[in-house]
């Protein structure tokens, strides 16, 4: 049984959360898997593919693509701000700062732990994109899950940090689709008559 170096943390963290953290953090430890987890955990490594994905949507789908790019940018900005704000309000220390025998630590940030911004941002992105284009659901949600898993595997977040981030991100992504994407697309419909009926029909179908 592992014990925390921080005497007061047992009043904050449940035994289940700590046990789940150690199970994920200590299983499947290998040099190759560690490198893979570090690779997908670097923000730039999933930021640029996301940008490329949105640019492709913009190029192929014209107005729908532009509406999706704008709505996604707004939604992810909101999720990132919310995550950073909650970190400061809740002020939960990262496991790599307060627990002993933590494996795989690459960079233990001085920022707080709850929630995981990696999780909240990646699930916001995955949800708003897949609401508009359901064919991308599998790859985007698998990617988001791997990113969240990597944060626990690398010892910088508890499972509940990632789970809460994922739930918040999914909610923000859904709200972003409903209140930003569809509203922006409706605005384009009124402002730009070149928006085709085919695009609008696709949008209505994907919304049901």
What are these regions (language model features)?
Residues 60-61, 90-91, 155-158:
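Short helix-capping/hinge motifs at transmembrane helix termini and TM-loop junctions
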Residues 43-46, 69-72, 135-142:
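Alpha-helical transmembrane segments
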Residues 32, 63-68, 132-139:
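Membrane-helix interface segments
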Residues 78, 82, 86, 90, ...:
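Alpha-helical membrane-inserting segments
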Residues 102-208:
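Membrane-embedded catalytic cores of phosphoryl/pyrophosphoryl-handling enzymes
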Residues 1-49, 82-111, 191-208:
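N-terminal transmembrane-helix/juxtamembrane module of multi-pass inner/ER membrane proteins
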Residues 51-82:
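Interfacial segments of alpha-helical transmembrane regions
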Residues 73-87, 138-151:
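Small-polar-interrupted transmembrane alpha-helices in polytopic inner-membrane proteins
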